[in-house]
Amino acid sequence: MVTVTQGVKVTSTCAACGGVLVRDLGQFIDRDQLHWGIEGRCQACPNAWCETDAGPAPQEIRQALLAEHGTTRLRLATEEDSLVPVLRALREMHHLSLGEARLSADELSGAGMVGTSVEMAHLAEGLRKRSVATTLASSPA
């Protein structure tokens, strides 16, 4: 089982009092599923909350993680004799049509797929379970 987490703190103005609102935004893998979470707390008033869910992160979280940590590129490590295991993994993990999975497989075979480190580690693990070797490379923010 893969354990990967990534987070970032961001500040904004509290809607309740105008104070400084500190939010911890994150993405993680739990029990082989992609998850995201937000914890927020105002430094001046009792306004606080926590929200988490399974699945792809909302764009606000993705963009904050990419801006802070940069991107991770996932590629197939070798030219596959058959893309069937790659297509199966992509269809299962991302609920893609066969055509969409083929486009994603072409991307993985070529320049690679880019996302957060957690997203790419999750996909790499799904491919590994189908005996597909991959490489991950990080690019700084």
Give the ranges of each region predicted by the language model.
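Structure-specific DNA junction-binding interface
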Residues: 1-7, 12, 20
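Short, amphipathic alpha-helical interaction segments embedded in low-complexity terminal/linker regions
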Residues: 10, 18-19, 23-141
